[in-house]
Amino acid sequence: MFSNVNVDYCKTLGCKNLGVLNSVDYVAQGKNILCRECGYLFPVISERSLNLYRNIVNHSWRGVIQQCPVCGSTSLKKYGYSAQGQRRMYCHHCDKTFISLEHINTTPRRTQLALMIEQGVSLADIRNSLLLNSTGLNRELIKLAREANYKESRQFISAFDISLSTRAFRVKYNGSNNYLYILVTAEEQSGRVVAISTNYSPLAVEQHYQYTSSYEERMPPGTLVHHVQRKELLTMRRETLFDIDYGPAVLHQNDPGMLVKPVLPAYRHFELVRILTHEYTLNVQHYLDQECFILGGCLMANLQDIRHGRCHISFVKERGTAPVCLEAVSRLFLSGGVRNNVWRAFSTRDYSMAVCNLTGSKKINDMKRATLKSASGFINYVERHPFLPSINRMSPANVASTLDYLKHLWNRQLS
């Protein structure tokens, strides 16, 4: 998570070049690279921009994740304590030391801030009550989010198999009609949210990876089959496969950060998900929103587990409330687009679901278990939360911190 990565390799499942850098089979074709082994193109993703973004947004996880924040090694040993009494760790790989969090000290002000967010108190009342200006509120929210992430990172329960659902959604910011792009991954058995990522970077990356579109890709009315096929058609029309248009997104001129293309947070997001869960489980099933770069991020983070058959990935679309036992007629259809994947659609009077098992079992009974229920549940929780009007008036940085705390509130109510 803290070491640099390069993801410019073939992402075709079953291809011998999957995950292989600089293969002799690769031929550059403009912004893409052709893999002559499988015949598919994959877009070039800037190694510099991806690692800049990862290093910036992962900074708040230093000491929370048991990895060296300098080189990413897990070969560590205890190395005494700091002057403040915090555990110090030594990295065998790079000979650096760092502070490992064993507890986080909160403050009465931060405790009161957390309570006011939970109750949906307005931003003006929070600032007046806690005597916070814009800078002070930003600092307190960052600390509150770090405290929440620390607590959540130690709450996982071991399980032989887990299913994780991932969805994308949008939240307004700065009191405008601009949107932040957000990914959320939740564990299906318990409903707990594992991780949240946004496309806001506190510092700028390469200009080419700044999100600049004001257009929104929209789905016309229709069945899930039509939506799947329409999504593939929209993806094919993009200048680059990962150049999604999710709506307008402009920052204030005095904001030092950047809204990056969603491909960067997608690749970082699944790294975080895997690090937070891999110690507690053996086999993982990922259910994903239908989006090519979300699949790419999941593939990169779980490459070794996919090769060993311990990780499986499916695209899922659903509408309505899933019944306890899905007894529905199913039919196969092709998605069209670049890959023309085979999907299976299930439908009842009140519920419909379409699934594409990219790896793993193709049995109908196994495919019936596919769902995005837990990720959708958290999105609905955010959209109904009394603090949402205040979130919509915050800066993107504060929105990201507040969502991390809402994740903690959501998980706490499930305990």
Give the location of each predicted region.
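Short, flexible, mixed-charge glycine/proline-rich loop motifs
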Residues: 1-9, 25-29, 54-65, 80-85
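Short Cys/His-rich Zn2+-coordinating modules
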Residues: 16-27, 45-56, 71-78
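Short, positively charged, Gly/Tyr-enriched micro-motifs
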Residues: 42-43, 57-61, 65-161, 168-170
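RNase H-like nuclease fold core
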Residues: 149-277
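Charged alpha-helix within mobile-element recombinases
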Residues: 325-414
